[in-house]
Amino acid sequence: VRTLSVLAAACLLALPAWAGQPSSALVVVLDAGHGGKFPHDGAHGAHGLLEKNVVLAVAQKTKELLEAQGATVLLTRESDLDVSLADRARIANDAGADLFLSIHCNSMETREDRKVTRGVETYFLSPDPTDAEAKMLAELENGGPESIPLPKATNAVIGILADLALGQARNDSAALAEIIQHHVIRGTWAQSRGVRQAPFLVLSGTKMPSALVEIGFISHPDESRLLAKTAYQDKVATALSNAVRDFADRVLSRRLVAQAVKPAPALKGSEQPAAVNVATELPLAIDAVATEPQAAPAQVALPANAVARPDGTR
């Protein structure tokens, strides 16, 4: 009984997070970027399309898909409102969200760049931007070249714990960005501009894994037409909801272990089992499960009969 109790708890890690578990255990905050009037109304695209309207529609569709499966989903804005970056992060923190996803459309300034630049890219927080382009985008979204505010610790112990928590959240954020990029590209077949990092203020204020996805270039004539179509917005929303579920399998598995390890029912007399030392034995069981080979979601191959893209890839 003693051994089985530990192994049963550890085996939860091998199960999908939503398997046999109410999806209401998952709390997601979706952030539709920008909103309100100039200068916070976001990018203006071809054919009069506005970023703030596209991303709100996608966020609302993604919310519906996740709620249909029982998840709790909050939007940082539900209409054309100007919500500060600090308030967007506060909404996620106050909700105790498991993840935060900020949805945006990209844009280029020059006429030549607007004709040729298109595709999807996903960002996670880092004070060191991938390149000059990532740095400029962060400054644009931040409203200026502001630096990331670092949390202040009241003492050494709290500082260490805060660093550990932030470190884990940032590692998880990188994984979240990879999973989002994979699913959006797979679901829309848009051009992939990869996973990148930059100092986005809206991400710096969150205490949970977070990412920012640019679902396309609203400045590109063809991509703008796609982003305006309800059917394409549905594809993006489906891809984002699949990405959230994929990532939740990892996040909730840790929570399930913490919540599910409970004392075994008391037995009579000599049948009473020895107490399980969870602090020492559960980590060993978890390590054993963790060593089992598992496919990384971001590396899932497309079917062999998938239609090839124009560049020959599948």
What do the PLM-derived regions correspond to, one by one?
Residues 5-16:
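Bacterial N-terminal signal peptides
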Residues 136-162, 215-224:
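The feature captures the short pre-catalytic strand/loop hairpin that immediately precedes
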Residues 26-29, 40-43, 49, 109, ...:
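Active-site-adjacent mobile loop/cap segments within catalytic or ligand-binding domains
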Residues 20-150, 167-178, 234, 256-271, ...:
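Catalytic-core regions of hydrolytic enzymes
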